[in-house]
Design a protein with these regions (language model features):
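Glycine-rich, acidic/polar active-site loops that bind/position phosphate-bearing ligands
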Residues: 1-376
Length: 376
């Protein structure tokens, strides 16, 4: 509203990484500051820090992980650009989930990704082929929330750089083709106090009250904070029945049709949020989860019994927003978001999303040309 001013960038020396896939290159993540030294509230890292400070006042730490999927194509980025991103060839001709042959064909470049990330201080646990053609997932070890978010953004750059160096291209677009599964970013979270997972009652050997309230907050508030899980026009095309992405709010111990899947036990007991796509900004998505969960704890929100069945076909369950416009309106009306994230933050991201929706509304798509060229 006041034009484009300058900001200061303060390097976080704890975030320094030597990028082994780039010759003689180091990377440091910075925090945005105003000239008076105060944080830029709207900056994604500031948004997450604010929620982590709330946890810190209770001596609680959030441990998180993000599972990013991406599509690998045989064309380079320049070739994909010249082709208008049409008729691209995925690195596999069929779905490769739990298949051995096709992931093996991609192993030289996937191995390079694993090795270079680990050598650069981003420790990789594993990689596997996924449900769509040319789709892969490379999982990084969990860590405290801010470290995981930093790793996340560097990870995406690494995957694209290494694909480019190998004569290919990689895309994190949430939904590349309607007949294929989308690229997700499942987020795992647990809370620890004095080194113990407070989502688990170690005496009773079952989920704790803290877990139940945190999950209750996620179920109640995630729809109105969905913009932070799905920030693009394309993201909402991922929310389709039978697509491995959720469409409704529910939780279960092991059910991939729901929004929240509960996994592990004891110290590893955690919540998996299946809403975010690979376009999610990790700082904002992590902050939204923590804000929702803390509201659940503070309000002592109860969570319902674990859902059993196919959530895709159960119309009694609350639905996720179906478009960027709907998610933007929900965020704009969210009292929780304005209270705990801040009105400036909400106004900024609502404004940004509305500009994106406006840009798309004026675009003429291939679908329109095919549907209307001759028929009307």
């Amino acid at each position: 509203e006041r034009g484009f001013g300058d900001f200061e960038m303060r390097p976080d020396t704890k975030s320094v990484k030597i990028l082994t896939w780039q010759s003689g290159t180091a990377l440091v993540v910075c925090d945005y500051l105003h000239h008076d030294g105060s944080p830029v509230e709207e900056a994604p890292r500031s948004v997450l820090r604010k929620q982590l400070d709330r946890l810190g006042k209770q001596k609680i730490k959030a441990f998180m992980a993000s599972e990013l999927e991406f599509l690998l194509f045989d064309q380079t980025y320049s070739e994909a650009f010249d082709a208008g991103y049409q008729n691209l060839r995925p690195s596999s001709d069929y779905r490769i989930d739990y298949h051995i042959l096709q992931p093996g064909r991609d192993e030289s470049i996937i191995r390079t990704m694993r090795n270079e990330l680990t050598a650069s201080g981003i420790p990789v646990e594993c990689s596997k082929g996924e449900w769509s053609r040319g789709q892969h997932e490379v999982n990084v070890e969990y860590a405290e929330a801010l470290e995981t978010a930093d790793r996340h953004v560097i990870f995406k750059q690494a995957i694209k750089d290494i694909a480019h160096n190998g004569g290919k291209s990689a895309s994190f677009i949430p939904k590349f083709a309607e007949e294929e599964a989308g690229n997700s970013c499942h987020i795992h979270i647990s809370l620890q106090k004095n080194g113990k997972n407070i989502f688990w009652d170690f005496q009773k050997k079952k989920p704790s009250k803290t877990f139940q309230h945190f999950l209750g907050g996620l179920l109640k508030y995630s729809p109105e904070l969905c913009l932070f899980y799905a920030p693009s026009i394309n993201a909402y095309k991922r929310y389709q029945s039978g697509s491995w992405a959720p469409t409704r709010m529910a939780w279960s111990m092991d059910n991939r049709t729901v929004g929240f899947r509960i996994v592990g036990h004891g110290q590893s007991f955690r919540i998996e949020n299946r809403m975010p796509g690979a376009d999610a900004n990790p700082y904002l998505a992590f902050a939204a989860m923590i804000a929702s969960g803390l509201a659940g704890i503070e309000e002592k929100i109860s969570c319902p019994e674990a859902y059993e069945g196919n959530a895709y076909s159960d119309e009694s369950l609350p639905a996720l927003p179906s478009s960027l416009e709907q998610a933007t309106d929900l965020l704009n009306k969210s009292t929780l978001a304005k209270t705990v994230l801040g009105s400036k933050v909400v106004d900024f991201y609502v404004h940004t999303a509305r500009l994106e929706a406006k840009a798309f509304a004026s675009a003429v798509t291939d679908w329109e040309r095919k549907r209307y060229f001759e028929r009307i």
